[in-house]
């Protein structure tokens, strides 16, 4: 899944672009600022996981390039599944348990949703846990200790998790004094490292500009120490937080319940018969459901990865302890059926409490869309291959991960001293509005300092020309413009017409109270907020659409200029870009016309979301063709 997502240009700057840059950086013995963060990777996460695999970079990366980290992560997931199987086989020679645990491991919902995050430290670090438990069970304590150290240094939450893992191991190995001694030692080591981590090591990485920002548990306290004190002083309130919505946003009322239900049905019910295995889930469930961010509470993205890594082992160790064979087989079947049912059910937007946290294009493997891309993949890869490995590059969200293994990579529209810019015209920076992104792209497309060297729609590659001698006053070959000043009315059906005779608006909204150019405008009030939907047929013969309108309004973000192309492309503008001497504000909405839209038609409309009336005049729609075509 991860390999295909990357190949089809679905991996994102957050996180895979940052991870690829950090991996390259570590492999070249550097510690640099990552593309989307004001600090280095170690300041974002105190983890050495990527450093473990620097030798793999030098062995494999010449061949696998930006796919290397995905290959490493997938290999660790498979290795973790293999060690989970080996542990179950230690406890039982029942062939159904062995087959069942492998099947179950890859049926759980969280195994699929985790791929929406591409590569993540949580996924990597979790894979060490079954490996450690296996070597602990077979009494290879030195090897287990080595895995413990790798685990502790892999992510900040691991030391606390290991304290509870060792408690379960003490219960499980209670007749083995040597095992108990090692487990108690493990608790002490984990606790000491956890204290040192937050008291010494993490503060050492902080600076005036960058502080550690991943302990987000305001309901408990500002630090792990404060959180522990709160839970000891207010145990009932702390337990309540595991189940209630403490965000004060009713949207997330049932998110925690959904998480518990999904994994209870997906085999977790078995643990009710062997509750000792619930113990090692306590810290990883707490880190989810007590967090300030409600999206972490539920079943979104990789936020359940620790659970789905340990749940197969827990469920099948519990099943292995059942005495009767028919009970074991029944439990295996029920767990696997529950898992596959919940996975298929919850990979559908309509079946989730918070639908927007699902990215089906990256995780819904049984959908045709999972195997398609918005790009001409081969053509875009050829385009990217022309960029020198040493060049400084500014790239947009889904392009950057493919170019991140270099000394200087920037997240467009941050250009700095870049020699190349490459972006998709639909690849918006999430912190900017659509029109802010559009204006940034057009600034460079129309600049005489940047040459469009290649393009494979919707991707453009630009090269910097420091002399600024290029003659690129316009990138368009032709433009078809229609206008409406709300003065021309059809005698036949009493509708307001565009300059080409097409219908623009109904006369019900016509007003003479205000006008910008002549005597009429249309009035949108609280009684009639919406203008007519204007259909723009056969628009795919053009490349670019620009809609301009003037409005007289009093409130901020009161006017909304909206356009749709098919079901999947929606564009919006509510901020004016200029104002004339009479107080009329100009709003512009522009976008590249999708080549793979579900329809050949686009449409537009204007609406008023405010409490006061607005007046609309001088509507202009411009359709353009690109010179390069």
Please state what every model-predicted region is.
Residues 18-27, 39-64, 230:
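Short hydrophobic/aromatic helix or loop-helix immediately within or flanking a transmembrane segment
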Residues 47-54, 66-83, 98-131, 153, ...:
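Aromatic- and kink-enriched transmembrane "portal" helix at the membrane-lumen/periplasm boundary
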Residues 83-86, 107, 122-148, 165:
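Specific aromatic-rich, kink-prone transmembrane helix
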Residues 96, 184-191, 322-354:
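Signature aromatic-anchored transmembrane alpha helix within multi-pass, membrane-resident enzymes
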Residues 160, 278-324:
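Hydrophobic/aromatic-rich transmembrane helices and adjacent perimembrane loops
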Residues 161-191:
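Perimembrane helix-loop-helix junctions
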Residues 245, 254-281, 285:
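Hydrophobic, aromatic-rich transmembrane alpha-helices
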Residues 473-629:
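Extracellular and organelle-lumenal recognition/adhesion modules and their flexible linkers in secreted
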């Amino acid at each position: 899944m991860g390999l295909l997502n990357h190949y089809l240009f679905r991996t994102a700057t957050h996180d895979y672009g940052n991870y690829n840059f950090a991996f390259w950086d570590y492999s070249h013995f550097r510690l640099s600022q990552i593309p989307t963060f004001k600090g280095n990777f170690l300041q974002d996460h105190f983890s050495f996981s990527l450093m473990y695999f620097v030798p793999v970079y030098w062995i494999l990366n010449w061949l696998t390039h930006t796919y290397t980290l995905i290959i490493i992560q997938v290999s660790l997931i498979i290795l973790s599944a293999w060690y989970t199987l080996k542990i179950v086989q230690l406890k039982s020679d029942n062939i159904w348990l062995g087959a069942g645990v492998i099947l179950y491991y890859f049926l759980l919902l969280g195994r699929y949703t985790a791929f929406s995050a591409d590569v993540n430290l949580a996924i990597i670090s979790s894979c060490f846990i079954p490996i450690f438990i296996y070597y602990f069970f077979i009494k290879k304590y030195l090897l287990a200790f080595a895995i413990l150290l790798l685990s502790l240094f892999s992510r900040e939450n691991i030391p606390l998790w290991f304290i509870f893992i060792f408690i379960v191991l003490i219960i499980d190995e209670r007749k083995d004094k040597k095992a108990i001694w090692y487990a108690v030692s493990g608790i002490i080591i984990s606790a000491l490292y956890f204290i040192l981590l937050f008291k010494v090591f993490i503060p050492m990485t902080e600076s005036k500009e960058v502080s550690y920002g991943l302990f987000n548990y305001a309901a408990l306290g500002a630090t792990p120490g404060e959180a522990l004190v709160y839970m000891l002083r207010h145990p009932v309130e702390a337990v309540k937080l595991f189940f209630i919505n403490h965000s004060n946003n009713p949207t997330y009322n049932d998110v925690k319940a959904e998480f518990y239900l999904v994994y209870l049905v997906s085999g977790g019910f078995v643990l009710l018969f062997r509750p000792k295995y619930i113990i090692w889930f306590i810290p990883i469930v707490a880190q989810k459901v007590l967090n300030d961010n409600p999206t972490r509470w539920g079943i979104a993205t990789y936020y359940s990865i620790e659970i789905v890594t340990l749940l197969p082992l827990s469920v099948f160790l519990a099943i292995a302890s059942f005495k009767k064979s028919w009970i074991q087989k029944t439990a295996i079947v029920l767990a696997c059926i529950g898992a596959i049912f919940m996975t298929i059910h919850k990979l559908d937007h309509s079946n989730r409490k918070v639908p927007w946290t699902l990215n089906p294009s990256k995780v819904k493997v049984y959908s045709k869309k999972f195997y398609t891309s918005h790009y001409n993949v081969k053509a875009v890869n050829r385009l990217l291959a022309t960029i020198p490995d040493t060049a400084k590059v500014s790239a947009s969200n889904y392009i950057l991960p493919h170019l991140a293994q270099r000394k200087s990579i920037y997240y467009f529209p941050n250009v700095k001293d870049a020699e190349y810019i490459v972006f998709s015209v639909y690849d918006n920076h999430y912190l900017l509005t659509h029109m802010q992104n559009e204006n940034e792209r057009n600034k460079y497309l129309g600049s005489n300092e940047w040459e469009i060297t290649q393009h494979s729609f919707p991707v453009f590659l630009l090269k910097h020309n420091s002399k600024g001698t290029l003659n690129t006053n316009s990138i368009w070959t032709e433009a078809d413009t229609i206008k409406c000043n709300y003065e021309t009315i059809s005698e036949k059906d009493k509708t307001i017409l565009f300059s080409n005779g097409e219908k623009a608006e109904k006369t019900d909204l016509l007003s003479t109270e205000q006008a910008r150019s002549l005597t009429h405008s249309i009035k949108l009030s609280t009684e009639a907020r919406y203008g007519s939907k204007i259909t723009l047929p056969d628009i795919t013969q053009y490349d670019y659409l620009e809609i301009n309108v003037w409005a007289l309004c009093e409130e901020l973000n009161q006017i909304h200029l909206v356009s749709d192309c098919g079901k999947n492309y929606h564009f919006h503008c509510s901020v004016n870009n200029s104002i004339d001497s009479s107080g009329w504000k100009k709003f512009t909405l522009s976008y590249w016309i999708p080549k793979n839209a579900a329809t050949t038609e686009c449409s537009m409309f204007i609406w008023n979301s405010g409490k006061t009336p607005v007046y609309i005049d001088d509507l202009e729609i411009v359709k353009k063709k690109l010179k390069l075509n």
